[in-house]
Amino acid sequence: MKFTLSWLKDHLDTTASVDEIAEALTDLGLEVEGIENPAARLAGFTLAHVKSASQHPDADRLRVCVVETNEGEKQIVCGAPNAREGITVVLAKPGDYVPGIDVTLSVGNIRGVESHGMMCSERELELSDEHDGIIELPSGEVGERFIDWLAENDPAKVDPVIEIAITPNRPDALGVAGIARDLAARGIGTLKTRAYAPVPGDFDCPIKVTIDEDTRDGCPLFTGRLIRDVRNGPSPQWLQDQLRAIGLRPISALVDITNYMTYDHNRPLHVFDADKVKGNLRVHRAAGGETLKALDEKEYTFQPGMMVISDDEGAESIAGIMGGDATGCTEETVNVFLESAYWDNVQIALAGRALKINSDARYRFERGVDPAYTLEGLEHATQMILDICGGEASTVVIAGAVPDHSRAYKLDAERVRSLVGMDIPESEQRQTLTRLGFRLEGNMAHVPSWRPDVQGEADLVEEVARIASLTKLVGRPLPRLTDGVPKPVMTPQQRRLSMARRTAASLGYNECVSYTFIDQASAALFGGGTDATMLENPISSEMSHMRPDLLPGLLAAAARNQARGFADLALFEAGPVFHGGEPGEQRAQIAGLLVGRTGPKDVHGAARAVDLYDAKADAEAVLAAMGAPAKVQILRDGDGWWHPGRHGRICLGPKKVLGVFGELHPRVLQAMDVKGPAVAFVLWPEEVPLPRKSGTTRAALALRDLQAVERDFAFVVDAGVEALTLVNAAAGADKALIEDVRVFDEFIGGSLGEGKKSLAITVRLQPTETTLKEKDIEAVSAKIVEKVAKATGGTLRG
């Protein structure tokens, strides 16, 4: 919501500065998002007088001017066609920043002639698009600040523009009058009350309006009147300036008046060209399939049940959202029908979302407008049209009635203290509510029609506290139930996630926090995107489904970083993923993503691309931090978004999956617009077994008194035999002595023959009772060879 300071002062008698107003608005809950003050960018420019202007000796289109400034006479080279002796101009000196051309001036040399400054055009000062010549002022003293001259002669050019963020519960603040009311209640000036007398009708309105019975819940009230013999030319300069200041383009007097009413009083209106309306108007629900070309020149198809305004020949307006092109006003329009109606906010929101139309009218109606101002807004707009466009007005046609909005709640002065903790005198509380438009009868506060958000006694307390300022609230420490510093309360799952985050960060990963909603295509890549995870009311089409995995968010972040030149990335995230709407279909997950290289090239060699072993090592480190057992199995056959043959599942047995690591499928990387190589891991903290003991200290490391022995074995097996099968067989030969089995070599080809390979392992034997003798080692070795042969069909390589 944007408005200018002068516009605000139309409703508020105040001497407060822009900064004071901005601070008060933010404190009142109307957060100021920005202030555009033209005076700030024009502060350095001064007025000067051209004493002489002669032809440049080396350029036909340039003139050498002698300019009188507050620092004496200066020579300036100028190419403007209107640069001549005797005019008063706006001067930019060396060192001044000229916003329209984004240049800080310095003393220049133009074709051999020095130039000590610049005489500015309106476009160079961002005052307008005019750039045919330099600014000529009808008055002004040499050295006078240009902003001071503008403030006196053309104040709209230096009128500050304030932009505030409006929360959905404050539709009254979508009008400048509502903002002024809040400021007046705070004490930042006095509210200017305006009474708009009804405009008497000079003739009966020839256009009648009816509302179908099944549509009255969506349109309780419709008012309108015919105004004939209007002149729809350009609107007055003051109106054009106000609209331009807030980013609206002036179109014509009639359209500008309706736009003004929208922002001034949060009262959207619509103007029909009455000569194009065929017969009477009817508010009804669409049967479905009807089409209408709207004012944005797009054609829309109505769904069954949408509210429509039709004449005798068909639909002419999308009710409460946008008018039709066929009955729109042009410069030739002389007779108009002015509409002011009250529409149900929910039905307008549903229709606008279905038709994908974002208009000022929809934005306001779906948040709620003042139902009691419907007729008064019509009278106000009628008077503006008569004043600006001329003409004569008919009597008002009214269909329906103002919906009952009356409600009252008890004002309990003690509730402010109990709910907010502020001591505010009862008289001040009553005065605050009165200034906000509440009507007090005894201890009952009647809510004004423009405040649909006030729905109970607690809301009255909020209004009182908001106007008094919550910055005055004094903090009080909570009472302690126990002495000393309380211990943090964390569940085992929370402790695991915290430790996992710290470990991933210590490994060099940057934490991401992404949306839990993603688009359907991305969700489908990772096993989701079904109706079970589709949102009923998504923020946008790109956020239509709950995420089935954390990797889509990490890949999207990687794609954005790569698009900005960051090729090497290490990202992780911890959060929930979803496979349905039931509690058991939501799980916690930790995911990490490595993209690009592990580091830059250096004196030790070239940069190394990330591989699946990087992801494996990091996954094991995070699992260890969460308390996972050291001995796990690495199995094949992960999900389809992993590269086949280049990933593994970290398991405790065939069914207990702790996580997955490996390369991502090239198809997934291409779909997510990520340039590889890319490896990742995902972990399931809930699958990590809890420790049997609840002690917080880790057991001391047990060192063996007896020396361990290592023996190497090389087995020739079929090419299809997995190394894990061989390792498990060797480890099971003697579980009491064999502490560890590791693969250290694989060989294919040579004398082994077709379909064979050699796998070499190191077996570590750790005695517990006595030192191993050679015969003991040989006995264990024989068991290992026997077990491997039985499990894999392999033979010891000679």
From Swiss-Prot:
One of its GO terms (molecular function) is phenylalanine-tRNA ligase activity. Its cofactor is Mg(2+). Residues 404-475 form the B5 domain. Pfam families: B3_4, B5, FDX-ACB, tRNA_bind, tRNA_synthFbeta. It is found in: Cytoplasm. GO terms for biological process: phenylalanyl-tRNA aminoacylation. Mg(2+) binds at residues 453, 459, 462-463. The keyword Translocase does not apply. The keyword NADP does not apply. It comes from the Bacteria. GO terms for cellular component: phenylalanine-tRNA ligase complex. Residues 39-147 form the tRNA-binding domain. Keywords: Aminoacyl-tRNA synthetase, ATP-binding, Cytoplasm, Ligase, Magnesium, Metal-binding, Nucleotide-binding, Protein biosynthesis, RNA-binding, tRNA-binding. InterPro entries: aa-tRNA-synth_II/BPL/LPL (IPR045864), B3/B4_tRNA-bd (IPR005146), DNA-bd_dom_put_sf (IPR009061), Fdx_antiC-bd (IPR005121), Fdx_antiC-bd_sf (IPR036690), NA-bd_OB-fold (IPR012340), Phe-tRNA-ligase_IIc_bsu (IPR045060), Phe-tRNA-ligase_IIc_bsu_bact (IPR004532). Gene3D superfamilies: 3.30.56.10, Bira Bifunctional Protein, Domain 2 (3.30.930.10), Ferrodoxin-fold anticodon-binding domain (3.30.70.380), Nucleic acid-binding proteins (2.40.50.140), Phenylalanyl-trna Synthetase, Chain B, domain 3 (3.50.40.10). Binds 2 magnesium ions per tetramer. Its EC number is 6.1.1.20. Residues 704-797 form the FDX-ACB domain. Its main location: cytoplasm. NCBIfam families: pheT_bact (TIGR00472), YtpR (NF045760). Tetramer of two alpha and two beta subunits. Belongs to the phenylalanyl-tRNA synthetase beta subunit family. Type 1 subfamily. This is Phenylalanine--tRNA ligase beta subunit. The lineage of its organism: Bacteria, Pseudomonadati, Pseudomonadota, Alphaproteobacteria, Rhodobacterales.
